[in-house]
């Protein structure tokens, strides 16, 4: 039998060679695949558009109108008048803005560093680390409304735990939530109880992504734990720090549930989110006014979200 120079018998059948057409057919989508893909993309998109984009854009549009919420034919276009009145003749606006700023600064200076410190400690794989993480993270699972109820009981003037402890030392009961000079700080401590666990988890995730070789190299060079953290670990946490900043800004703006549960957001606890609710669902039903304040909150949040997005794109280019 003759044999070709390629080593394949001339009489043998040619081996099956996949063609381009065969490759295309192997990756051809079935009708079921298309339906599943359409549902997986379409349903979340519709939910996002219906529950996020439509309300947000509607709020922006209504901020340029005067409307009492009764009948679409009663909507009146007034341009920037709502914004001018908010910044010039609306007394609660600047105190609420100041309280939100205090909320943000307090979050950045107190619970965020505490969360970072706890993350560094728990990253060392101590005994019962998982238990500690669960206990510290537990308040994050609770809604802000439930946190408000818990701390309202803690701060109670007559039967609260804090005043009961102070009474053992001969201190008279303190009205933590009724005193305008104290209630904001009392509520900030309650909010920090939840925020610490949130920051701890974020920083733990960031610490797990730091290359252990960097820490080992710093230790070989004779760096102390503090020096290794300051000059090696913390700079490597820059992406997480941006995330923490954005989340903290958003948390400080959306702090509505906690103060509304405690005293309805009055008497020293005015916040921008409370003003939005009071104008939209209050007795006056000033939909345009409340929408204008909500739009101001949206703009503030968008600034930090854009900073975060630009940072992500910059990291990807590297």
Provide a role label for each language-model segment.
Residues 2-31:
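Short, Lys/Arg-rich, polar N-terminal cytosolic tail immediately upstream
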Residues 1-2, 15, 96, 129:
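Compositionally biased, low-complexity segments enriched in small residues
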Residues 33-318:
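A structural signal for multi-pass alpha-helical bundles of membrane permease subunits
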